A protein has these predicted regions:
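C-terminal beta-strand-rich structural cap/linker in extracellular carbohydrate-active enzymes
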Residues: 592-618
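Carbohydrate-binding surface patches
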Residues: 529-566, 610-611
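An acidic-aromatic substrate-binding cleft motif
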Residues: 244-312, 316
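N-terminal accessory beta-strand-rich subdomains and adjacent acidic, glycine-rich linkers
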Residues: 26-270
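Aromatic- and carboxylate-enriched substrate-binding clefts and catalytic-loop regions
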Residues: 318-477
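Glycan-recognition and catalytic regions of carbohydrate-active enzymes
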Residues: 115, 500-545, 582-585
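Solvent-exposed beta-strand/loop surfaces of large extracellular or lumenal domains
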Residues: 92, 104, 171-179, 183, ...
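Bacterial N-terminal signal peptides
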Residues: 9-18
Length: 618
């Protein structure tokens, strides 16, 4: 890990702006990323408004935008300042290895500083911690103790994101909702984060949140003063002990959508390092849901998992009674015909883990009783159902619950409306979360491709894939389902959500599912247009997996394999849509030798896909 200190770059800039809510200022203090591509600058505008702006390359992606918050009782931190002082910049260059992830090594490389907006009088100035990465910029508010005042009550946050034009925005109004591409000025209400916008010049911008643990979730609403400005909207007030460090507000930008996915480790870098000393019990893997809630079904799922290279089975809602009733007790098995202990013992003998679903009602009431019981039972993980979300109370509760699960060596999957903000780095027993319109919502490929380039910036998503369910033939294809298993990252990958072991009938493409990893050493997005198509390549050891997904228009893409090791021959196993295949899934398989000079021509049908495994062995 390397540190170096630099003098802060200062500049005097006269702006010819006269746009409502995008204010002009004269003196700007600047912090640049290590490669110089990103620059975040600070100044004071009219009425002492604290301002920042962001540049990516030669382009200004965030125009002068307001900062600050308002306390309960009226104390206002959004104006009255006379000066912006940017402290000495520090260069940080380190790396760390995640317990699991999309890459085996994460570089943490940025310039950081603290900016202080000063104002006259006894009130403290507004202080921010700022980082400029090669992939984006981030800042968070710092509030220290003030005399005898040891806490703060924040009513609302006023962080603005003022854009250069009425950009097209990929809007989603709930974490599991459907995306629509609209102008900023056409947003109906507050939208989820990450929020991705596309400029006329082809640049892609993302606004995100990182390290949300004990604070209210940020959403983004259109400003009442400017149709091209988004303003942070907290899900309720915040009460915090001082000193306070808020979650990070993140601005990313790139010249292509795939670069934002390749850079999504930025959110991880903004979270604290792993706090679990012994992580040997944390195990990624593939999952089948047991839909009959029976002993026989559980045993069959274990056998299926062993045969097809899965690592877990899951019992979902109903195993302990009606999840909607408080009278149900998750400390006991109430489902007739289910000997859960027998299934767990059988699974353990076969090195298969058992995951249990518990509704938030019973977790909130009984978590401290449940965890030692589940440890004795020998379960591998918990799926939190219908978690309360958004406000500070339930955000804090959920993170505390995940930390408690770690004490009992229990892994966690969170459903339904929650989206990750990088805290899986700190507690890597937090395996995945929903917060996506996955296969339960039967998304056509155009929605899947919107999710891929928007939601997946936030981190792992439990997509609850279905493979044999009848909806697949209505909105996508089976080859596309295989491709999505590569494109969408989750260390716990639910591959058979509505399916049963009896659904499988010896389909030859199951060789792909058996070989498929769920964690990776490297990620590359080779092609991509939001909502239209994507080609995602992931490496595990010496092998590569390439997922090619397409929306409405049939197309052929050229895929260069120049990322393969030179002077080495591989074998490409390609799984594609084939109406003439003699199976109900209509997946054809072809094999050919390839090397780093190979360029694959990949045809994809409307709402189809192609999955490719490139193996280094014979």
């Amino acid at each position: 890990m390397k540190y170096a200190r630099f003098a802060v770059i200062g500049a005097v800039v006269l702006l010819g702006l006269s746009v409502a809510a995008c204010e002009a200022a004269e003196l700007w203090s600047s912090l640049a990323s290590p490669d110089g591509m990103f620059r975040i600058e600070f100044s004071v505008g009219d009425k002492g408004k604290p301002l920042y702006r962001v540049r990516h390359g030669e382009d200004e992606v965030i125009l002068p935008s307001g900062l600050g918050f308002v306390e309960v009782g009226g104390e206002d931190w959004t104006g009255g300042y006379v000066k912006a002082e940017l402290g000495e910049a520090e260069l940080h260059d380190g790396s760390w290895r995640p317990v699991w992830g999309e890459r085996s090594l994460v570089r943490d490389h940025y310039r950081g500083a603290v900016v202080l907006f000063r104002r006259p009088g006894p009130l403290a100035g507004l202080k921010l911690e700022v980082r400029a990465y090669d992939s984006g910029v981030a800042f968070r508010y710092l509030v220290g103790t003030r005399g005898e005042k040891k806490s703060i009550n924040i009513e609302s946050e006023k962080t603005e994101f003022c854009f250069t034009a009425d950009h097209k925005t990929w809007a989603v109004y709930s974490a599991q909702g459907k995306y629509s591409k609209v102008k900023l000025s056409e947003l109906r209400s507050s939208v989820e984060r990450p929020c991705v916008l596309e400029t006329e010049a082809g640049k892609v911008i993302a606004i995100a949140e990182a390290a949300l643990v004990d604070y209210a979730r940020m959403r983004l609403r259109r400003s009442e003063d400017s149709p091209r400005t988004l303003v942070s909207r907290l899900h309720g007030p915040v009460t915090a002990a001082l000193p306070l460090r808020t979650p990070w507000r993140v601005v990313m930008a790139a010249d292509r959508a795939g670069k934002l996915l390749e850079n999504n480790h930025l959110l991880l870098n903004l979270n604290e390092p792993n706090k679990i000393k012994d992580t040997s019990w944390i195990r990624p893997g593939k999952v089948i849901r047991e839909v009959t809630l029976s002993t026989k079904g559980g045993m069959a799922c274990v056998d299926f998992a062993v045969e097809h290279g899965l690592q877990f089975i899951e019992y979902d809602a109903g195993w302990y009674g009606d999840q909607g009733k408080l009278t149900s007790d998750a400390r006991t098995v109430s489902r007739g015909g289910l000997d859960l202990q027998a299934v767990i013992r059988y699974a353990e003998k076969n090195n298969i883990g058992v995951i249990l679903y518990v509704n938030r009602r019973h977790l909130e009431r009984d978590l401290d009783d449940l965890l030692p019981i589940y440890r004795r039972w020998g379960i591998a993980g918990l799926k939190f159902g219908f978690v309360q979300h958004g406000d500070q109370k339930w955000t804090r509760w959920m993170h505390e619950a995940i930390a408690k699960c770690a004490e009992y060596e229990i892994m966690v999957d969170v459903h339904d409306e929650y989206r990750m903000t990088g805290w899986e780095r700190t507690y890597p027993n937090f395996m995945t979360a929903e917060g996506i319109g996955g296969d339960e919502t039967r998304p056509p490929n155009e929605q899947a491709l919107a999710n891929l380039f928007n939601r997946m910036i936030a981190g792992p998503a439990d997509h609850t894939f279905c493979y044999f369910n009848g909806y697949v033939d209505q909105t996508t294809s089976h080859a596309a389902q295989l491709a999505k298993m590569i494109c969408f990252f989750s260390p716990w990958q639910f591959l058979f959500w509505y399916d049963q072991p009896s659904s499988a009938a010896g389909e030859p493409e199951f060789e792909f599912i058996t070989a498929l990893p769920t964690t990776w050493d490297e990620l590359r997005v080779l092609h991509g247009k939001i909502g239209r198509y994507a080609v995602v390549a992931r490496r595990k050891g010496d092998d590569w997996y390439i997922g090619c997904l397409n929306a409405r228009k049939a197309r052929t893409l050229e895929v260069s394999l120049d990322f393969l090791a030179a002077d080495k021959t591989y074998k490409a196993h390609t799984y594609y849509d084939d109406p003439g295949a003699g199976t109900r899934t209509k997946v054809g398989i072809s094999r050919r030798p390839v090397d780093s000079k190979t360029v694959l021509s990949v045809p994809m049908s409307e709402r189809g896909g192609v999955a490719i495994r490139i193996s280094s062995g014979k």
